[in-house]
Regions:
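Alpha-helical transmembrane segments and immediately membrane-proximal extracytoplasmic
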Residues: 1-431, 436-438, 450-456, 460-461, ...
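Amphipathic alpha-helical regulatory segments at dimerization interfaces
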Residues: 443-450
Length: 478
């Protein structure tokens, strides 16, 4: 079996395992625990998220042995790390924390633990079959596993593959893993839907007839979504700082009380627990006939505050769906202002907000098409998402992204010339170009090319400390 075929087989195995793991998490946490929480009496339901973040801290502290609540960021950190694998020791504690946070109503998404489970399983498969994976492919199954996690939880295989490949960089992609990611996403999706069926996450009926005003509206929607995503990203980063630097009992108590107050206030205003859970209930509420502009804007703020408090308390979950929900609610507010009922603005608002927040415009557009089942929204979503990217700039909800892939030649050229030294000949040619020890490899390489000399002599005062040759420079790439 050739190397590419081995990789694809392992990607398919990874996808099946991830599909099973995500299905188990969804059943236990999403279908049992969260539904039980939402059926509690109003007072107990308001307190549930506070209990959830407290249990999350216990899980991370004692089961995870001091692990952090990071989930999707663990995938990014592993991808950019030296060995390209997720450490498996904290996995039980992180999953306990995610289950407690999400199952008891924390305002975060199920894709966080799904991505983490996928990346961890991909790392496990790679370690289990080291003889089948060479150094060039050490991150491939990591990406494939993350793709499988997203594909399963959202029933969106294309989104899973694109997101996992796109999210490591703001202006680049993990393109080497694209085909294995597709295979793993397909295998995971097929496994997951065997248990939970084929229905879409946000089904929408009909397609709007697009006119010039809708396309102009998409420009405005992208601007608003970009500004909103910048504000939301700032809130997320501030919440993560609080979670990282505040004493656990203080943050859990303060944020838990805040979550209880938000939940109680939301119930009084909306007669529904719209601040709890990932936000699917909030999306459904925006499609009711009783919506008003003021209540929609208030809900936009309520969901943002609930998510921020959950993160600040140290809860474990995802940001993907909260971004989508914020964009959907913002788009609904615009739809009310322009007196439309096509759901065009909620859909493209969700795409633009999500794409800007995570710096994944392609994945956001694909997700909207898959989750709603309406590819006719893609053109205005493209426009809105493009504008949102421009407004977002270099901001992101995660600090674990890199802007772009580091060029190995640029990295090599930035190294000190001492790293490329070879022993000098005896004698050194008097015609050899001269460098000093404070030069970089790039400067020495340029001098070699321009002079066509066999080597550059590195001189410290009156002493030749070594030479730089083409071979000694290329040896740095090994």
């Amino acid at each position: 079996m050739t190397r590419p075929h081995r990789i694809l087989v392992l990607a398919a195995v990874t996808g099946v395992l991830v599909g099973l793991a995500v299905a188990a998490f969804e059943q236990v946490v999403g279908r049992w625990l969260l539904e039980w929480t939402l059926d509690l009496p109003a007072g107990l339901r308001a307190l549930a998220p506070a209990v959830g973040v407290a249990l999350a801290w216990v899980g991370l502290r004692y089961v995870g042995r001091g692990a952090t609540p990071a989930l999707a960021d663990e995938y990014l950190d592993a991808y950019h790390g030296r060995d390209g694998a997720v450490p498996l020791e904290p996995l039980p504690g992180k999953i306990v924390a995610a289950g407690a946070t999400l199952g008891l109503g924390g305002a975060m998404g199920f894709e966080g633990p799904s991505i983490y489970l996928g990346a961890a399983i991909g790392s496990f498969v790679r370690r289990r079959f080291p003889q089948l994976i060479d150094g060039r492919d050490q991150r491939v199954l990591l990406v494939a596993g993350a793709a499988a996690g997203v594909a399963a939880i959202f029933k969106a295989p294309a989104t899973g593959a694109v997101f996992a490949v796109e999210v490591p960089y703001q202006e680049d992609s993990a393109s080497r893993a694209a085909v294995p990611a597709i295979v793993a996403a397909a295998a995971s999706y097929l496994t997951f839907v065997l248990f939970f069926g084929l229905h879409r996450l946000f089904p929408i009926q009909g397609n709007p007839d697009l006119e010039a005003r809708e396309l102009l509206g998409a420009l405005a929607m992208g601007l608003l979504a970009g500004l909103g995503a910048r504000a939301f990203a700032a809130m997320v980063r501030a919440s993560k700082r609080i979670a990282g630097y505040t004493e656990p009992w203080k943050r859990v108590t303060a944020c838990g009380l805040g979550l209880a107050a938000v939940a109680a206030g939301t119930w009084l205003v909306y007669d529904r627990p719209l601040s709890l859970g990932p936000g699917y209930g909030a999306v459904q509420w925006t499609q009711t006939a009783s919506r008003s502009f003021g209540l929609i804007v208030l809900l936009l703020l309520v969901r943002a505050v609930a998510t921020s408090l959950t993160i600040a308390a140290g809860g474990a979950g995802g940001i993907f769906i909260p971004l989508f929900v914020e964009g959907w609610i913002l788009g609904t507010a615009v739809e009310v202002v322009v007196n439309s009922n096509t759901l065009l603005f909620p859909v493209i608002g969700a795409a633009a907000f999500l794409g800007a927040g995570y710096r994944t415009p392609i994945a956001a557009i694909v997700f909207v098409a898959e989750a709603t089942g309406r590819p006719g929204y893609i053109v205005p979503a493209l426009i809105a998402t493009g504008v949102g990217q421009l407004v977002m700039g270099r901001q992101s909800v995660t600090a674990s992204q890199l802007v772009r892939r580091e060029d190995p030649v640029e990295l090599r050229d930035a190294r000190p010339v001492a790293d490329a030294l070879a022993p000098p000949p005896d004698p050194v040619s008097p015609d050899a170009p001269v460098a000093t020890p404070d030069w970089t490899v790039g400067q020495a390489r340029s001098t070699l090319v321009e002079s066509a000399a066999p080597y550059v002599a590195v001189v410290d005062g009156d002493r030749v400390v070594g030479i730089v040759t083409a071979a000694s420079i290329l040896a740095l790439d090994d």
